Amino acid sequence: KGEVTVEQLMNDNSHESIAKAEEQLKLMKPNIAGWEADFGKEMMTKGKVWMNFTWSGDAVWAIEEAAEVGVELDYVVPIEGSNVWFDGWVIPKYARNVKAASYFINYMCRPDIALRNMDAIGYVSAVATPEILEAKIDSTLENYSDLSYFFGPEADSVQVDPVQYPDKEVIKRCAVIRDFTNKEDLQKVLEMWSRVKGDN
């Protein structure tokens, strides 16, 4: 059919694409130790599995935990691409106390608090202030990354942990997986996963 972008591929919910994904996942199944992300990171830290599909924040945790027991782990984004994810704070439309929720979000988005939260959970904050960038620079690292996509043009060559902040070139080969706005598409994918995992 010609070339498709990573975004088109990741958001293709056609019957044909879901069937192909199911076929490939079933072929891989004998080599899969588990499907749950938390299970994989635990197994990685113990040196019991060699590869895991995981979110970068979980990878940070696993790398740190594994290092404590002498297991060396790394985190890479496939050349073919991956998904871009981001976490943020939101207020549901049915919230009872919007004012309190707003205060909480404002508190969590203060750079000093965002940094403490990042250190506690391993995930990057949506806050992109100079204070966050300065705190994340690690001059002991050999590689420089272009983070201008996140922190602005002044961050085009900085020493940061690439697990938490991938280089701009890595981000270019990734895409956002959109939410399922069509319930039928969501149901098709859930049913496919059920068949792959053997739930039915």
Label the predicted regions.
Residues K1, E22-K26, K41, T45, ...:
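Non-transmembrane alpha-helical segments in soluble domains
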Residues K1-D74:
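Ligand-binding pocket segment of bilobal, Venus flytrap-like solute-binding proteins
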Residues N13, S17, I32, E36, ...:
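Extracytoplasmic/periplasmic, Sec-exported soluble proteins
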Residues E23-K26, V69-K93:
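Periplasmic-binding protein-like
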Residues E42, V158-N200:
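Conserved C-terminal helix/tail region of periplasmic/extracytoplasmic solute-binding proteins
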Residues G57-V60, E80-N83, R96, C109-D112:
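Solvent-exposed loop/turn segments at secondary-structure junctions
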Residues P92-V170:
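Mature extracytoplasmic/periplasmic domains
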